[in-house]
Amino acid sequence: MKKQYLSAISLAVGLISSQAYAADCSAVNTYPDWPQKNWQGQPSHANTGDKLVHNNTLYQAKWWTSSEPGTGSAWQYVGRCDTGVHITPVEKYGRLQVCGTGLCSEAKQRIQLRGMSSHGLQWHGLGKCLTDKSLDVLSYDWQADVLRLSLYVQEGGYETDPVGFTNQMHTLIEMASARGLYVLVDWHQLDPGDPNYNVEAAKTFFTEIVTKHKHRNNLLYDIANEPNGVPWSAVRHYAEQVIPVIRNIQPNALIMVGTHGWSTFGASMSDGDLQDVIDDPVPFENIMYTFHFYAAAHTDYHRNMLDRASDIFPVFVSEFGTQHYTGGGANDFVSSQKYIDLMARKKISWTNWNYSDDPLSGAAFKVGSCASQNFADSELKEAGAWIKAKILEGR
């Protein structure tokens, strides 16, 4: 058996990141051992500024309260308690690379990443569903490997405020990196479906992101979310323009390219097919192709396409749901489990849509969870509870 190794650099980054947001919980009472007593001399409450540990998490009271820490507005989240070195995904695997038809660690061992995708940053981003608390939950409680940060280009996204959304992406990359997560930077073009429509904006965005974060070993780049309404040749033409922009700054960057038919290798369009990519693949190394599915709508035909494509190309399922492709409707966990089994067997990495409290059934949390900053299991929707269990499986 070959031993997995960790370079001194990746180990140092992992150790720094795993402890960057750890709270000092020493000499702090643990709930229900209240710091303040009632007139009978029994521990009963907290005063303004008092701290209390609950579920390995440090909270501070905003005002007098006898409520359970973390369950209401009376408590301010401080951070996860530092209980020792937490081995992060980045510390474990180092800089990722493509080897053969799979994703591999720095030690060239085949791996599978499992994690979550954000919703659109313009709706559920920084300070809303993506906060210190929610990222701690994703990293430490869910034990995710990767967070996909979905930056819509249109629909109130990047094109409305390029500087503001680029800065938000910078901050979120730093926050996720501090927890040792892999970060999938998602250029979420959707409508218009031709990625060439946004090619100049993409060049500007990736130049700024890659330049600032080129020292990191945990970033992955998805340059085209869901190309649609155009043939594979148009997607390939776009990739040929954007990939060199990234590679000129970070030569060993791992880059993902969406495929025609909403990233289905043509399965979701009438005149496209996997053969289009086989005949004319992207002419760069260290490239993966993305595949998306929604299990209630995309059953055997799409599942077979994923199976076929992953025999030939390195594939990353950067978005999927257990429901309809609208992101809503009933969950189909039978179809979803078939996909999970296929991806586990072939070590296909995935990120599930989505880590938010959006009203649709595809969101992990119930509406209002982000506003209250309550990300407990009691706040999970059916899909959220199911996907959390899949991320934790075998940990």
Where are these regions (language model features)?
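Tryptophan-rich substrate-binding surfaces of secreted polymer-degrading and adhesive proteins
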Residues: 23-86
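N-terminal carbohydrate-binding accessory modules
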Residues: 84-146, 159, 390
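N-terminal signal peptide c-region/cleavage motif recognized by signal peptidases
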Residues: 17-19
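Extracellular glycoside hydrolase catalytic/binding regions
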Residues: 199-220, 224-349, 353-357, 362-393
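Aromatic-lined substrate-binding rim segments of carbohydrate-active enzymes
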Residues: 131-192, 199-204, 247-249, 335-346
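Soluble non-cytosolic domains of exported or imported proteins
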Residues: 40-46, 125, 129, 160-167, ...
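The substrate-binding groove and active-site-proximal loops of carbohydrate-active enzymes
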Residues: 122, 153-162, 189-196, 224-230, ...
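Bacterial N-terminal signal peptides that target proteins for export
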Residues: 1-8
